[in-house]
């Protein structure tokens, strides 16, 4: 397990179809356990993702983090997700969000609106 820091974020990216993909994400390690959440909606396809658990939180760079977990897709359980986020400046300047699902769906890029925020460990 990594860190003690945590990440939160929300906003939107352009999806592969050119539509808006809205998301809310958080992840970290608290009291020795992974925690977090994910919600994502692709407004082009109608795809809806709701995270149901976090199985990994990893430091991948000075301002980037990797989160993995389980999810429901369009209300159906049994999927997994991978999220990569980067907090590249304030407020949300050049921040990135990327999502991959076990069903093959992928979307990601620089935020068109919103912010990824990396937080220091709570004391």
Descriptions of predicted regions:
Residues 9-11, 67-71, 99:
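Residue-level detector of buried hydrophobic side-chain packing
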Residues 2-5, 60-65, 90-93:
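Edge/loop elements at the starts and ends of beta-strands within beta-rich repeat scaffolds
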Residues 1-16:
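Boundary/junction segments of secreted and surface-exposed precursor proteins
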């Amino acid at each position: 397990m990594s860190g003690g820091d945590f990440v939160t974020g929300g906003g939107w990216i352009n999806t592969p179809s050119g539509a808006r993909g809205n998301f809310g994400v958080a992840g970290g390690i608290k009291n020795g356990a992974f925690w977090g959440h994910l919600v994502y909606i692709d407004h082009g396809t109608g795809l809806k993702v709701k995270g149901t658990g976090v199985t990994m939180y990893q430091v991948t760079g000075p301002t980037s983090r990797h989160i993995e977990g389980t999810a429901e897709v369009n209300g159906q359980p049994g999927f997994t997700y991978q999220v990569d986020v980067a907090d590249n400046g304030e407020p949300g300047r050049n921040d990135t969000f990327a999502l991959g699902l076990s069903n093959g769906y992928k979307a990601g890029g620089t935020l068109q609106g919103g912010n990824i925020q990396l937080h220091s460990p709570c004391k």
